[in-house]
From Swiss-Prot:
One of its GO terms (biological process) is mRNA processing. The gene is matK. It comes from Tsuga canadensis (Eastern hemlock). One of its GO terms (cellular component) is chloroplast. This is Maturase K. Pfam families: Intron_maturas2, MatK_N.
Length: 514
């Protein structure tokens, strides 16, 4: 990458047309095929691969020759697979060509990402899971409105090509990308749609396509939002000091003229914050209701003008934190007022001051969790436990271990919430469902199962000690668990509640597109 960048600085004409010749290099397809075999071997044993899955470089040469002879690279995919992006039984040739196309397009993208980290570009990534919980702890309590939106993934294929065209000067290198996208658009599943729905399948090409599209959305939108509002401050500092400081600033503003407000406003805290998890960005705003209405109005217009796609206004929802809760990542997010007692000693006198501060208070959504358990056949819709019939063929230890693992995952995921009393209702449902499953397996009653297995067995698996049997929990954390907040940033990736809302919204939108 460094060599490409150095050559690009020396010769700008070479920088404009260096991508397209890479499609004719056999080494590129060898690398992509090795990557394809590595991915396949991780999910499928090598002895189960047929002889047709082996790549012949003689056929690769013929495919490269077809690219040289034909102006349109669509013939390359016709000979390999009728629908390479939709059919899961992909041939090694179409997969290798897509991998090679991704490798070529990743060259300028990697250079841009590398030098943006070094300071050439001021844009920073907001999609890290580690940035979500500091946002909730630090920025969320200082906002009074939340804009809940989503990044639209339904877009015309030509718009995707134009996003690449903004930073790739080599126009011929985008012809294979255009052919692949239009091939997918003309597939039987998308014939009734006028736009392409970017599928979220775990392939290198589609992940690269989606990441670049999100990069383009955020690199334009986030600096625009921050430029429209006041500069950011480095930190909030202690709450009492900042509270008295804001009172002084408000007093100064009343006495100054209007033209001097810019220097005063620069001392205040930022008024807008942005974070994203998956396809769902969250914009926290501290301002008036009129400001929130302007943001809701301009966000769809910005997407319509910049990306040439229509985004319905109902996709941007606003929530006032003092009245409503906002659901995200499987939590019900709210802000509550917390009284703070401050004692100040000056010489021989002691002053006691009561301050009211805002505190982030996530709520455990018991009703959605019960709905998810009902969907997985652990209970009915009213929360009454039932037996898990599909697990009756397992051993007793496996059944107990599975139920206990589900409970510990739920408990660890919601360990960042202070009020966890409602979680023990979930524990009751899982423990009783486990007992009913064992009773159904042994064709007996719950009382007989408890008498045969012993009450100590259920205490062993569903005990409070096992709730803290986790590397992040220590003995001190277990003792002070009710007043300490511990976040587990790896669990949202596997928690169904974090993505259930998004799946429902995607199904509604896709039905409207058909």
């Amino acid at each position: 990458m460094d060599e490409f960048h150095r050559y690009g600085k020396e010769d700008s004409s070479w920088q404009q047309c260096f991508l397209y010749p890479l499609f004719f290099q056999e080494d590129l397809y060898a690398i992509s095929h090795d990557h394809y075999l590595d991915v396949s071997s991780s999910s499928e044993p090598m002895e189960h691969l047929s002889s047709n899955d082996k790549l012949s470089f003689l056929i690769v040469k013929r495919l490269i020759g077809q690219i040289r002879k034909q102006n349109n690279s669509i013939f390359l995919f016709v000979n390999c697979d009728p629908n390479p992006l939709v059919n899961h039984n992909k041939s090694s040739y179409s997969e290798s060509v897509l991998e090679g196309l991704t490798l070529v397009l990743e060259v300028p993208f990697s250079i841009r990402s590398k030098y943006s980290v070094e300071g050439i570009n001021e844009w920073k990534s907001f999609r890290s899971i580690h940035s979500i919980f500091p946002f909730l702890e630090d920025k969320f309590p200082h906002s009074n409105y939340i804009l809940d939106t989503r990044i639209p993934y339904s877009i015309h294929p030509e718009i995707l090509v134009r996003t690449f065209r903004r930073w790739i000067r080599d126009a011929p290198s985008l012809h294979p990308l255009r052919s692949v996208l239009y091939k997918y658009r003309n597939s039987p599943e998308n014939l009734k749609r006028s736009i392409i729905v970017v599928p979220r399948v775990n392939t290198r090409f589609l992940l690269f396509l989606w990441n670049n599209y999100v990069y383009e959305c955020e690199s334009i939108l986030v600096p625009l939002l921050k430029r429209s509002f006041h500069p950011r401050s480095s930190s909030y500092g202690s709450f009492p000091e900042r509270t008295h400081f804001h009172r002084k600033v408000k007093h100064i503003i009343r006495n100054f003229r209007r033209n001097s407000l810019k220097s005063i406003w620069s001392l205040k805290d930022p008024k807008i914050h942005y974070v994203r998890y998956g396809e769902r960005p969250i914009i926290a705003i501290r301002g008036t209701h009129l400001l929130v209405k302007k943001c809701r109005y301009h966000l769809p217009i910005f997407r319509q003008c910049y990306f040439h796609l229509w985004s319905e206004p109902y996709r941007v929802c606003s929530h006032q934190l003092s009245k409503n809760c906002s659901s995200s990542l499987g939590y019900s997010l709210r802000v509550r007022m917390k009284p703070l007692l401050v004692r100040t000693k000056m010489l021989d006198k002691l002053f006691i001051t009561d301050l009211i501060t805002d505190e982030f208070d996530p709520i455990v959504p018991i009703v959605p969790i019960i709905g998810l358990l009902a969907k997985e056949k652990f209970c009915d819709i009213s929360g009454r436990p039932i037996s898990k019939l599909s697990w009756t063929s397992l051993t007793d230890d496996d059944i107990l271990d599975r139920f206990d693992r589900i409970w510990r995952n739920i408990f660890h995921y919601y360990s960042g919430s202070f009020g966890r009393d409602g979680l023990y209702r979930i524990k009751y449902i899982l423990s009783l469902s486990c007992a009913k499953t064992l009773a159904c397996k042994h064709k007996s009653t719950i009382r007989v199962v408890r008498k045969e297995l012993g009450p100590e067995l259920f205490k062993k698996y569903f005990s409070k000690e096992r709730e803290f049997d986790y590397p992040a929990f220590s003995s001190k954390a277990a003792a002070h668990s009710q007043r300490e907040r511990i976040w587990h940033s790896d669990i949202p990736q596997i928690n169904p509640l974090a993505n259930s809302w998004q799946k429902i919204q995607d199904l509604r939108i896709e039905r409207k597109l058909i």
